[in-house]
Amino acid sequence: MHSKNLCLSLTSLCLLAAADTALAEDWQYSLEAGMANAPRYSGSDERMTAPVLGGRIISPWGVFLDTDTGLGWGYEGNALSFSAYVGASDSRKDKNESMHAGSKRLKGMGEIKSRPQLGVSAAYNLGGVIIGATLEHAIEEDKHKETGKAFTHLELSLGTNLYEGRYGSVDAAINSHFGDRNYLQTWYGVTADQATRSRFKEYEARAGNISNGMNLSWSVPINEHTQFSTLLDVQYLADEAGKSPIVEQRLQASVLGELQYTF
């Protein structure tokens, strides 16, 4: 399983603490390890549990290297934060593999390969409410292939801190995801050729709303350098995605438990 989706959700909530893109006085390093339980792919009613491993390096000048987003630069002001990065897009296989999204139920749909991806993310603190937006564009892998076209994804979010005290910190956010036509067609559409090779009927997906949902995280400090975080992510697939024949369940829930060590 690629840890990116869940870890990005956790990172977006951590914007409240301004930990990921702030200009540090010194180099910052962090390591993360945990377990995640999530649907095998977006729309699946099958579930899988897999380890989640990651790391992050942030320089005093805002340059960062992150296993979830990639290589980039970030800035943190009093209320506004911004980052731009180059990384790798998500992938999906048409067979069961313990460390990758996908399912044998998708046999014949072909593999969606990871490819270079450009991203920008911004957040504004409006009196304790974090308004966030993340735009990602995956580069074309093969324009003649059903799963290789360039696509664009946008996430809009509103987050806030619900509790901070002796039992740690609880943060929550609501979000909506949007995609262009190529994104929806790549992840939820079924072409005529795919229909002949798989068990799904042909389906042409259009640009629009992918899903709407919420994240809830609880972070508990263990000592000066270590904290344990849990995340619940719930998404409801909207019409263009939810009506796809590959979608077996529109309500998608994922959970993550992660230990983070910063030094």
Regions found by a protein language model. Give the residues of each.
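N-terminal signal peptide c-region/cleavage motif recognized by signal peptidases
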Residues: 18-19
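Residues that define the transmembrane beta-barrel architecture of outer-membrane proteins
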Residues: 27, 37, 47-53, 57, ...
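Residues on the lipid-exposed face of transmembrane beta-strands in outer-membrane beta-barrel proteins
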Residues: 33-37, 53-59, 69-75, 118-124, ...
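Transmembrane beta-strands of outer-membrane beta-barrel pores
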Residues: 35-39, 59-61, 86-92, 126-128, ...
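Outer-membrane beta-barrel domain signature
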Residues: 40-44, 66, 71, 107-111, ...
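Outer-membrane beta-barrel translocator domains and adjoining extracellular loop/strand segments
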Residues: 43-48, 95-100, 143-150, 183-191, ...
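Repeated loop/turn-to-beta-strand initiation elements of outer-membrane beta-barrel proteins
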Residues: 61-65, 80, 128-131, 166-170, ...
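Outer-membrane beta-barrel transmembrane domain signature
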Residues: 139, 143-227, 236-238, 263
